[in-house]
Structure formats: C-alpha cells, structure tokens
C-alpha cells in the first residue's frame, strides 16, 4: 500500500514538473513573439523617420506633405502649429525609446543559451566582421566597418539637404526675382544660404544628445555604451558648431553689408529672435573651444564646467527658432533630460564605501557595498564624486569587480593621473586615521550584454591602467566557468607597464587566485618598458577599512531590478502628461489669445512647453524612484556592513609565478603576438593609449586575418 502511494506521489511530481516545463516553454515563446513584434515596429518607425528626414529639405515635403499635415493638425485648438512636429518628430522617437526599454527587459529575462549551437556562433561571427576596423585616422580614431557605413549615410543626408537647400537658393533667387530697391543678388543669396546652413545644423542637433544619454535604451538596444558612443557626440558636436557658426557669420556679414547692424539686437515678439540665437551661439562656442584635446586634457575642470552651458545653449536655441521648429531636434534632448534627472536623483545619496587599497604604483582600489540584486556587465563604468575633493566634479572609472562573482561588492580602480585622482591617492596613502569618506555615485553604465563566450580564445591587450576593464571580464568568466554553465575561452592578457611598481595592479585581478587553475585557462604576459629589473615590492598593499554612516546606502539601481520596464513607463507616461498639460494650456490660455487677433508671444509659448516637459519628467521620474525605494530597499541594510574575506583579500604571491611571464626593458611585439593566432574566432580586446589601440586596430583591420574579432575599449575623451 505504501509502495503504491509512493508511486502515485512520484507520478504526481513528474506531472507537476512537466506542467512547469510546458509553462516555462510557453512563457519563453511568448517573450520571443513579443520581441519579434517590437523589432518589426522598430523597423517601421525607423524607416518612417528616415523617410521624413530625407524628404524634409525637398519642395515636395514643404508644399504638399507639410501643407496637408498643417491643414489637418495645425489648426487644432489643443496644439496648434507645434502639433505637427510633436506627431511627426517627437512621438516616434519617444515610442521607439519606450519599445527599446521593453525589448531590453524581455531580453534580460530570457534564459536561452545563445551560444550552444555552432550555427548561432557562425551567425554571430558573420556579423562580427562588420565590427572590424576599417579606418584608423588621427581625427576620427578607430572606425569600424559599421561606423563607416552609418557615417557615410549620415553625411549623405547632410549633403542631400544642403544640395536641395542651395538649389533653391541659386535657382529661385535670380536678378529678375529681386526688387529694384532691394538687396543685391549676392546679399539675397547670402541671406538664403545663412538660413539653409542653420536648417542643416538643426539636423545634426537632432542627433547630438542621443550618444550622451548614458542610460538610454536606444544605445543599449544596438549594443552601444555611453563611453563607446562619446566619439559620435564629438563628431556631431563639431558638425553642429561648424554649421551654426557659419550660419551666424553669414548673417553678421549680411547685416553689416546691408546696414542693418541693429538686427543683431532684435528679439521679435512672434518670429525669429536674433539676440537669442547669438546668446546660444556664444554658449556653444565657449563649449566648443574647450573640447579640443590639448585644452580638454590639460584643463579638464574648465572643459567640465563650461559644458554646463548646454542648458543655456538649448534654452536660447528654443527662444531663437520658436518651440514649433525646435521640436524637430528635441526628441534626443527629451530622452537626455529623463536620463539626466534620474542620474541626479541617484547622486543625492551617499554610498557605503567599506574599504580601500593603496597600491605602490599610486593606484587606489575603492570597495563599495552593493545591493546583491544590482547586476552589471563587464567593462561597465561608475561615475564617482567625492565632495571633500570637489563637490561638482564627477569622474568615470571602470568597475573591476563582477556582480556575479562578488554579489555584495563593487570595486573601482583609480590611477593617480590628474589633480582629482592625485588628491584622492594622497588622502588615502598619507593617513591611517580616515574612518569615513563621503562618496556619491552615478551608474553603473555598460553594455546590456556581452558575447565574449562566443570566442575560442580571448587576447586582451592593455597599457597601464587600461588593464581595469579586463579585470572585470576575467572575474566574470571565472564565475561562468565555476558554474559549468558554459565553456569559457582561453585567456591571454598582454599588459604593458612603465615601471615595475605597476605590476601590483595584477594583484587585483582575482579575489582568490588559489582557485583559478581549476576553472579558467589564463596566461599573463607582462612587459615593463622602463626598467631592466624589478625595483619594487609588489605585495606591499595598504588596506583601509571605513565605518559607513547609517545614512550611507549600498549602491543600488535607481529604478530597481526592473529598471528597463520602469524607464519605458517614465518615458511614455511623462510624454503623455506633457501632452495633456500642453493641450489644456493651449485650449484655455494660448488659443483664446490667438483668436482675439493678439498673437501669443513666441518666447512665452516656448517657455510654457519647456516648463511642461520639465514638470512631466520630474514628476514621473520622482514617483518611479520613490515606488522602487519603498519596495526595493526593504531589508537592504542587513548583512552589508562588513565584507567577507573573499571580498577583501587576494593571494598575489601565487598569481604572478604560476600564470605570469614578466619581460623587463622591452615593449610587446603586438604583430608577432597577434598574427597567426589559432582558432576560428579569436576576440582581440585592447584598452590603453591611443597609439596602442591604433596599432592593434591595424593588425585586426578589415582584410587582415579573418579569425581576429577586434574590440576597442576606450575611456579617453
């Protein structure tokens, strides 16, 4: 009887397990369907947006499309003329960003092994060829095949726009079309050219803020990070300021030649405000002047502080052209505003700094307490602010820990290279009496996912502190290997240092090096370029323990574990609230004034729109943060005051002899070390000085060895 009962129970358990498997499979299938639908919608929206941008400079768009849309939407008592651009330019991009957030949330939840089959690996490697370096130029840096393709398409859009605009200028403005008592031919054409340069500059401005929205779903959905896309912001910024400066100079020449210098101070009540445009241009020029590498690197504080003028630039740009036209280039700025305010909310709290280690190479490792539910990818960065050094300065540093291997700790390594980092090193190295250090952070920011497991082997090339992102990758692979979930690639770390004291950074690679040989296959080739023999004891590491205040919090995601879903909610709900506010104000305030033959002042309309956007973003972001803070931080302060031995200690004595070959007085011959590497897919990662990155890029460039998959990790702005 008992045996029969056990048999029934066993059958019941198998039946229950079968139901669970079927439910899980159905759930994953539903997620896949939703993701495919999102991809389809995204493609439709992108294609529609591209068509609009292509058609915008043509007469067909102005005389037929725009005229038709204004006839249907422009007379609305709720939105008026701005309603057209709200629908055509703002709405699609906000929808796209919201869909991207939902897609990333579903992708994060999916538990499918995408590297199990050879077919998947070959498919990924096929597209990996598009990431190979194609151009290595001083002005552009390292440009991949994909980047060249998109750069050419974007430049084609600008040239197409200029060609259409200039065609209108030189074909329609002729000696016969000019009034007898009006401008000369060259003056009339100069006036028209100035307008067209401004219109083309507005296209670049429309894309300017997307690369610097650090937490944007649009970047993460296409595999970009805020650091890797900073160069796009630089390219776009140079184009914006070149076109806008040319626009301003042309108008200055025109006004001087036509004796209309007083126009420079004009602030039209309902039209274009010249004075506002000049203020915006001056703010832009001040920012632009500090972005050149020689100034930015030598006077980083000047560069940092002057970039806050972007608020002045955008405010007076809107006053200059009016809100209706400004909405064309506003979607990227709107997404940036949401991201910026969320970062502001996160930065208001001090975090728990538990310990620090001071290395002999003037490098500091900071160890923070972390919420175990905060997950981040290798190579992620953290922005750090220490008020006792500077209340305003925020500096990005690579995270060296792994959120999987070290669930309660987050570490960053800071090399003493500038005023801020030198002050921090001096503060920690010269005193044993520091019990507490107030620190605020923003982030982490990094790729939504990594695909290092697809390679047969990984070769990491670093110079100096460029080793930091590779520490996080190695630790992450160590965790993956220890779980036996995937087969990890063979790792070769080629690191170049100036002095033997810099070798102490190798001590931070693993939390516990005694277990490494049983999990991953790693070889370290270290090169000390300026010394023939070791002149430093690498194991002299000073450890400081801090006593966090009760108010200090572990580093946690501002929007909780479902941050992408919350971001989609913020974007969509804030935009809806903004629309409702504008509809009410337009219906009961702006529209009645316009109807009484008194046109509403353009500056006031612009200010109302900007305030409505700000209120909607602040309100929705704050509510989302408070909702997550209430539920997510419950029970957070248990078991986080102290770090376990694994989190603080390492075993440097065993790491160097067993896995490392040290070469003194020579530089690595990268061509010899990289060319001829065996394996169908060899991932080559490089992080270090510009010359080193460019040398590796040339070796792995398009047309070279087909098995080398290049990736540059650069944190140099």
Curated annotation (Swiss-Prot):
Its cofactor is FAD. Keywords: Electron transport, FAD, Flavoprotein, Heme, Ion transport, Iron, Membrane, Metal-binding, Mitochondrion, NAD, Oxidoreductase, Transit peptide, Transmembrane, Transmembrane helix, Transport. Residues 1-23 form a transit peptide. It comes from the Eukaryota. Expressed in root steele. Detected in shoots, leaves, stems, siliques, flowers and cotyledons. Its EC number is 1.16.1.7. Heme binds at residues 233, 247, 307, 320. It is a multi-pass membrane protein. SUPFAM superfamilies: Ferredoxin reductase-like, C-terminal NADP-linked domain (SSF52343). It is found in: Mitochondrion membrane. Induction: Up-regulated in roots and shoots by iron deficiency and copper deficiency. GO terms for molecular function: ferric-chelate reductase (NADH) activity; ferric-chelate reductase activity; metal ion binding. InterPro entries: FAD-bd_8, FAD-bd_FR_type, Fe3_Rdtase_TM_dom, Fe_red_NAD-bd_6, FNR_nucleotide-bd, RBOH/FRE. The keyword Phosphoprotein does not apply. NAD(+) binds at residues 443-446. It catalyses: 2 a Fe(II)-siderophore + NAD(+) + H(+) = 2 a Fe(III)-siderophore + NADH. Its main location: mitochondrion. FAD binds at residues 395-398. Residues 346-451 form the FAD-binding FR-type domain. Residues 198-317 form the Ferric oxidoreductase domain. Gene3D superfamilies: Nucleotide-binding domain of ferredoxin-NADP reductase (FNR) module (3.40.50.80). GO terms for biological process: monoatomic ion transport. Ferric chelate reductase involved in iron reduction in roots. May participate in the transport of electrons to a Fe(3+) ion via FAD and heme intermediates. Belongs to the ferric reductase (FRE) family. This is Ferric reduction oxidase 3, mitochondrial.
């Amino acid at each position: 009887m008992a045996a029969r009962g056990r048999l029934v129970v066993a059958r019941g358990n198998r039946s229950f397990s079968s139901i669970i498997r079927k439910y899980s499979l159905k759930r994953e299938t539903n997620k896949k369907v939703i993701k495919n639908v999102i991809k389809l919608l995204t493609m439709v929206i992108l294609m529609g947006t591209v068509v609009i941008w292509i058609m915008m400079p043509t007469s067909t768009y102005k005389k037929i499309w725009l005229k038709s849309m204004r006839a249907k939407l422009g007379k609305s008592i709720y939105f008026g003329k701005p309603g057209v651009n709200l629908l055509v330019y703002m709405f699609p991009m906000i929808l796209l960003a919201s869909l991207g957030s939902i897609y990333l949330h579903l992708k994060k939840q999916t538990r499918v092994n995408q590297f199990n089959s050879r077919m998947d690996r070959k498919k990924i490697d096929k597209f990996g060829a598009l990431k190979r370096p194609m151009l290595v130029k001083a002005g552009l840096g390292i440009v991949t095949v994909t980047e060249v393709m998109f750069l050419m398409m974007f430049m084609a859009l600008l040239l197409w726009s200029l060609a259409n605009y200039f065609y209108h200028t030189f074909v329609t403005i002729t000696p016969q079309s000019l009034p007898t008592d009006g401008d000369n031919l060259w003056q009339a054409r100069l006036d028209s050219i100035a307008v067209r340069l401004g219109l083309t500059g507005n296209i670049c401005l429309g894309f300017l803020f997307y690369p610097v929205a650090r937490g944007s779903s649009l970047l993460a959905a296409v595999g970009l990070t805020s650091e890797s896309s900073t160069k796009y912001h630089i390219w776009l910024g140079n184009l914006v300021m070149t076109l806008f400066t040319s626009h301003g100079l042309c108008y200055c020449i025109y006004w001087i030649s036509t004796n209309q210098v007083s126009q420079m101070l004009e602030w039209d009540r309902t039209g274009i405000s010249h004075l506002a445009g000049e203020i915006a241009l001056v703010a832009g020029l001040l920012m632009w002047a500090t972005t050149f590498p020689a100034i930015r690197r030598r006077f980083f504080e000047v560069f940092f502080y002057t970039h806050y003028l972007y608020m002045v630039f955008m405010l007076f740009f809107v006053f200059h052209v009016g809100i209706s036209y400004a909405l064309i280039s506003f979607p990227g700025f709107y997404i940036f505003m949401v991201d910026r305010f969320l970062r502001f909310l996160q930065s208001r709290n001090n975090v728990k700094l538990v310990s620090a280690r001071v290395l002999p190479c003037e490098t500091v490792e900071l160890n923070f307490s972390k919420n175990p539910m905060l997950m981040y990818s290798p190579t992620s960065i953290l922005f750090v602010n220490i008020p006792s050094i500077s209340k305003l300065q925020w500096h990005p540093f690579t995270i060296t820990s792994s959120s999987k291997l070290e669930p309660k700790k987050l570490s960053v390594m800071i090399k003493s290279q500038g005023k801020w980092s030198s002050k921090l090193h001096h503060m920690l190295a010269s005193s044993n009496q520091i019990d507490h250090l107030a620190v605020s952070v923003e982030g982490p920011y990094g790729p939504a996912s990594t695909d290092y497991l697809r390679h047969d082997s990984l070769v990491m090339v670093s110079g100096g502190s460029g080793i930091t992102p590779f520490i996080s990758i190695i630790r992450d692979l160590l965790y993956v290997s220890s779980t036996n979930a995937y087969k990890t690639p063979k790792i070769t770390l080629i690191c170049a240092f100036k002095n033997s004291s810099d070798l102490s950074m190798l001590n931070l690679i693993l939390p516990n090096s005694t277990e490494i040989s049983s999990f991953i296959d790693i070889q370290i080739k270290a090169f000390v370029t300026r010394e023939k023999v070791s002149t430093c004891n690498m194991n002299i590491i000073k450890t400081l323990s801090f006593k966090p205040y009760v108010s200090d919090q572990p580093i946690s995601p501002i929007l909780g574990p479902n941050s992408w879903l919350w971001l989609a909610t913020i974007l969509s709900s804030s935009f809806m609230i903004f629309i409702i506010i504008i509809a009410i104000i337009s219906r009961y305030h702006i529209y009645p004034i316009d109807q009484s033959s008194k046109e509403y002042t353009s500056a006031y309309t612009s200010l109302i729109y900007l305030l409505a956007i700000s209120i909607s973003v602040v309100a929705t972001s704050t509510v989302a943060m408070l909702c997550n803070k209430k539920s997510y931080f419950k029970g957070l302060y248990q078991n986080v005051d102290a770090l376990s031995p694994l989190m603080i200690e390492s075993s440097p004595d065993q790491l160097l002899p067993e896995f490392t070959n040290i070469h003194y007085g020579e530089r690595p011959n990268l061509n010899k070390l990289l060319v001829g590497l065996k394996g169908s897919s060899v991932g080559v990662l490089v992080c270090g000085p510009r010359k080193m990155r460019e040398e590796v890029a040339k070796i792995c460039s398009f047309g070279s060895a087909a098995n080398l998959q290049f990736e540059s990790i650069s944190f140099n702005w």
